[in-house]
């Protein structure tokens, strides 16, 4: 971090899920549109080292960065909103902070000192914030996870309070997102929760510079004056976060209120006028869609759609590029069997089986894949979805009825999917993996090059000889079965650079049947979409028209 870099801290109050991530990403978009180099950070107060082993039903999606970090789903928002890519340095947790401090204590780096939250934990938080910012960055927006008042967030709030003192007011800014409940019966907007939230923040030693008030309807100047009076925040530093049809409208709404101009003024930034023409085009494309196409997503985390956040967005983005609204029909794979499978898919244009872990709901996914293959329904499999497509093909085309994955059935005699026995850690060291190895941080993670087969549909879609996609898996196609599968008509249209790992499969006789070991959804953005998803949606549109 250079001596001119500015830091905007975004906190949240009253309740969770107000949209801190979208607000932070929207501010980054606005500042980027003014010619500034902007990056972002997410600080998570949970004690897990990373979200890699957390249930998607509790935490939502685990977003994987290009350099192989398992991170919070908000980093997906960041990458979809701004051009800079996130890395391991852009997300850290309480667990990671404590892990670093305790390792240093064991090494004797603290020279016998008593290790305490202040100064040792707060110093490590400050170090990670400052060291994670490249020298060419003009502004970094740091989102503090959790809600003000939570005991877990206190070390982070104390650390940023100290940073304000150390860096000065001209280099730091506190933006606080809060809730203004609208009581329909009374027809009133209530400001009391916001007053108490700011009071709670002040009790920690932080005075908000800017307030963003989430409300389902616009509030007028009288409410602004009241909020300003009781929070010590200037009236012209209070902004509305109103509900919109698409989250990609949020930057435009903030710009209309002069939010970015106020940030430039408060931080004394040398910035040009905002050029939001490209972003306006993105929003216009979303708003102008005419048709609709329905995709069935067959998974086991469907009770929380946030578990598939990037995948949902990738499908929506592809639909916008093709001029249709994508409607996702979430199907719980545990409910699917041979007797009812048709009832789930009779009204859909395509089927998708996403990634996942564990044996629950596996047979329902395999039955769904078989239905798509036999009925010429466009199919896309991702990660586990590709592995199950290989298992289904081995069972029903090769006749290997007990074909399985050693992850799901360790004693299977025909493990067409097996464990990758060698993996590379974050520090670049190579380790050997067994079925009893730790689960956390021991996967094939991050961007890897995939070489595409000449003449394949994948090569035609990507219009390239090789691509880089992000991975998150421990298991791969067993190379001992590849030749037999190819002889039976399955094409391995993408392989790792060393030709050892199978990355893409397709069935040439099928209308559109592709599955990939990687997670291409992590690189889809509303600006650029993603070629694989666009081809898939096009196939779904054509199938729907027929």
Curated annotation (Swiss-Prot):
One of its GO terms (cellular component) is cytosol. CTP binds at residues 16, 150-152, 190-195, 226. It comes from the Bacteria. Coiled coil: none annotated. The keyword Metal-binding applies. It catalyses: UTP + L-glutamine + ATP + H2O = CTP + L-glutamate + ADP + phosphate + 2 H(+); L-glutamine + H2O = L-glutamate + NH4(+); UTP + NH4(+) + ATP = CTP + ADP + phosphate + 2 H(+). Keywords: ATP-binding, Glutamine amidotransferase, Ligase, Magnesium, Metal-binding, Nucleotide-binding, Pyrimidine biosynthesis. Residues 1-269 are annotated as: Amidoligase domain. The active site is at residues 383, 519, 521. L-glutamine binds at residues 356, 384-387, 407, 474. Its EC number is 6.3.4.2. GO terms for molecular function: ATP binding; CTP synthase activity; glutaminase activity; identical protein binding; metal ion binding. Gene3D superfamilies: 3.40.50.880, P-loop containing nucleotide triphosphate hydrolases. Signal peptide: none annotated. Pathway: Pyrimidine metabolism; CTP biosynthesis via de novo pathway; CTP from UDP: step 2/2. InterPro entries: Class_I_gatase-like, CTP_synthase, CTP_synthase_N, GATASE, GATase1_CTP_Synthase, P-loop_NTPase. ATP binds at residues 17-22, 74. Mg(2+) binds at residues 74, 143. Residues 294-546 form the Glutamine amidotransferase type-1 domain. Allosterically activated by GTP, when glutamine is the substrate; GTP has no effect on the reaction when ammonia is the substrate. The allosteric effector GTP functions by stabilizing the protein conformation that binds the tetrahedral intermediate(s) formed during glutamine hydrolysis. Inhibited by the product CTP, via allosteric rather than competitive inhibition. CTPSs have evolved a hybrid strategy for distinguishing between UTP and CTP. The overlapping regions of the product feedback inhibitory and substrate sites recognize a common feature in both compounds, the triphosphate moiety. To differentiate isosteric substrate and product pyrimidine rings, an additional pocket far from the expected kinase/ligase catalytic site, specifically recognizes the cytosine and ribose portions of the product inhibitor. HAMAP family: PyrG. Homotetramer. Catalyzes the ATP-dependent amination of UTP to CTP with either L-glutamine or ammonia as the source of nitrogen. Regulates intracellular CTP levels through interactions with the four ribonucleotide triphosphates. This is CTP synthase.
């Amino acid at each position: 971090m250079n001596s001119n870099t500015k830091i905007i801290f975004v906190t949240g109050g009253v309740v969770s899920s107000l949209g801190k991530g979208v607000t932070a990403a929207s501010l980054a978009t606005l500042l980027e549109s003014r010619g500034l180099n902007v990056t972002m950070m997410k600080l998570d107060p949970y004690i897990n080292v990373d979200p890699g082993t957390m249930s998607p039903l509790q935490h939502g999606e685990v977003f994987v960065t290009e350099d192989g970090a398992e991170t919070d789903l908000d980093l997906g928002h960041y990458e979809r909103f701004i051009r800079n890519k996130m890395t391991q340095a852009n997300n850290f947790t309480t667990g990671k902070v404590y892990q670093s401090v305790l390792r240093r204590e064991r090494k004797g780096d603290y020279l016998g000192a008593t290790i305490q939250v202040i100064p040792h934990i707060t110093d490590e938080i400050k170090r990670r914030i400052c060291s994670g910012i490249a020298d060419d960055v003009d502004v970094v927006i740091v989102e503090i996870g959790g809600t003000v008042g939570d005991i877990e967030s206190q070390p982070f709030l104390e650390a940023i309070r100290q940073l304000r003192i150390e860096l000065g007011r001209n280099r730091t800014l506190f933006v606080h997102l809060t809730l203004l409940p609208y009581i329909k019966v009374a027809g009133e907007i209530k400001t009391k929760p916001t007053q108490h939230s700011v009071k709670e923040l002040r009790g920690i030693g932080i005075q908000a510079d800017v307030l963003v008030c989430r409300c389902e309807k616009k509030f007028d100047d009288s409410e602004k004056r009241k909020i300003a009076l009781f929070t010590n925040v200037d009236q012209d530093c209070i902004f509305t976060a109103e509900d919109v049809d698409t989250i990609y409208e949020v930057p435009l709404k903030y710009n209309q209120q002069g939010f970015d101009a106020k940030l430039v003024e408060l931080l004394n930034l040398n910035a040009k006028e905002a050029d939001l023409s490209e972003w306006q085009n993105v929003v216009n494309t979303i708003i102008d869609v005419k048709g609709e196409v329905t995709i069935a997503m067959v998974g086991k985390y469907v009770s929380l759609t946030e578990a598939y956040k990037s995948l949902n967005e990738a499908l929506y983005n592809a639909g916008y590029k093709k001029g249709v609204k994508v409607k996702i029909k979430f199907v719980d794979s545990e409910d699917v069997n041979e007797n009812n499978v048709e009832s789930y898919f009779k009204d859909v244009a395509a089927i998708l089986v996403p990634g996942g872990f564990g044996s629950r709901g596996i047979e329902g996914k395999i039955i769904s894949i078989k239905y798509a293959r036999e009925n010429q329904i466009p199919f896309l499999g991702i990660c586990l979805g590709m592995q199950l497509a290989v298992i289904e093909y081995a069972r029903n085309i090769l006749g290997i009825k007990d074909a399985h994955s050693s992850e799901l059935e360790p004693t299977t005699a025909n493990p067409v999917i097996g464990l990758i026995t060698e993996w590379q850690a974050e520090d670049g060291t190579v380790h050997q993996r067994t079925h009893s190895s730790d689960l956390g941080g021991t996967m094939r993670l991050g961007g890897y090059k995939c070489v595409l087969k000449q003449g394949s549909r994948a090569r035609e879609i990507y219009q390239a000889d090789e691509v880089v996609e992000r991975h998150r898996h421990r298991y791969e196609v067993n190379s001992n079965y590849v030749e037999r599968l190819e002889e039976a008509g399955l094409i391995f249209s993408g392989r790792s650079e060393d030709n050892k790992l199978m990355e893409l499969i397709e069935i040439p006789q099928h209308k559109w049947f592709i599955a990939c070991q990687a997670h291409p959804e992590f690189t889809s953005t509303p600006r650029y979409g993603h070629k694989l998803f666009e081809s898939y949606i096009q196939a779904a549109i054509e199938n729907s028209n027929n």
